[in-house]
Regions:
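Structural preference for beta-strand elements that scaffold enzyme active sites
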Residues: 2-6, 30-33, 60-64, 95-98, ...
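Active-site mouth loops of central-metabolism enzymes
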Residues: 2-18, 69-80, 125-136, 238-240
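Catalytic beta/alpha-barrel core
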Residues: 10, 31-41, 94-106, 123-132, ...
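Short, acidic/polar
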Residues: 12-25, 78-89, 134-144, 194
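Active-site-adjacent beta->alpha loops and helix N-cap segments on the catalytic face
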Residues: 39-54, 101-117, 133-136, 160-175
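Glycine/small-residue-rich loop that forms an oxyanion/phosphate-binding "nest" at active or ligand-binding sites
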Residues: 63-106
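C-terminal alpha-helical cap/extension of soluble enzyme domains
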Residues: 164, 172-239
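N-terminal ligand-binding/catalytic initiation module
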Residues: 205, 231-260
Length: 260
């Protein structure tokens, strides 16, 4: 399985968004995620305008629309009505729309149907910035998102210890046999960075990389992530070997920066 690389753009206005898109495009991602919650005054006209211009810039690169709410680590809180409105509008020009299904269960079915009707696929997402839920909770969350109609199910968690990362990677590897849709999983922060690389263990179909800026703690720079993922084509690495490889690579880059 080839892991796709997705790079976020987080401009605070149209000009910043489009400028970041041009820069990120040079990093050759498979997908580009527009984090629309960074724009303060967002409405359907703004979304239609920016998504159309983004598609013109990025060409064949897949576009993911995300409005990350404050409840799940984003910049803004909005009503269910507005959330549904902007997600459905974005679906007209985007390939994927991120939906925080667990936080919008009352509207999830209709929202997902509307997004698909407008031509986009749905990434059901759930984020835990304070902890790593139990294995049972993680599996239950992912199954519920699939049941609601997600085409891809994504979960991000925060570890408190190395054991949390190892446990999360283990349950992630089980999810590929439990769900019937692709998964995206990540353990965040410095501790969890290895999970973004060990995708042959986690079965994560996409890894998010830092472009102009990082959109979540622990994101690896796009060029480093690509090199590390490429190595796995030639070596079958276990968890400890992959972690050691990542640490050595970062140490080498740190030494190079000190010499420059």
């Amino acid at each position: 399985m080839k892991t796709k690389i997705c790079i976020p753009i987080m401009g605070q206005d149209e000009k910043e968004v489009l400028n970041q898109a041009e820069k990120v495009l040079q990093m050759q991602p498979d997908l580009i995620e527009w984090r629309a919650d960074y724009i303060e005054k967002l409405d359907t006209d703004v979304i239609e305008n920016i998504t159309a211009k983004l598609k013109n810039i990025i060409g064949n690169v897949k576009l993911v629309f995300t409005f990350r709410t404050a409840d799940e680590g984003g910049k803004q809180s909005i009503s269910d009505e507005k959330y549904s409105e902007i997600c459905c509008k974005a679906a007209e020009n985007c390939d994927y729309v991120d939906v925080e299904i667990m936080g919008h269960m009352k509207i999830a079915k209709n929202l997902i149907a509307g997004i698909k009707k407008n031509g986009a696929k749905v990434i059901g997402s759930n984020h835990h910035f304070d902890n790593t839920p139990s294995n049972g909770e993680i599996i239950d969350i992912m199954k519920k998102m699939e049941e609601q109609g997600a085409d891809i199910c994504k979960i991000a968690v925060m570890p408190e210890a190395k054991e949390d990362v190892e446990r999360f990677m283990d349950v992630s590897s089980q999810l590929k046999d439990i769900l019937n849709v692709p998964i995206i999983t990540m353990s965040m922060g410095e501790l969890g960075a290895v999970s973004r690389i060990c995708t042959n263990i986690t079965a994560s179909s996409v890894s998010f990389a830092a472009g102009v800026d990082a959109s979540a703690p622990g994101q690896v720079k796009a060029d480093i992530l690509r090199k590390l993922l490429k190595v796995k084509k030639y070596f079958l690495l276990n968890y400890n070997q992959e972690r050691q490889l990542y640490q050595r690579h970062c140490q080498k880059l740190h030494l190079l920066r000190k010499l420059m």
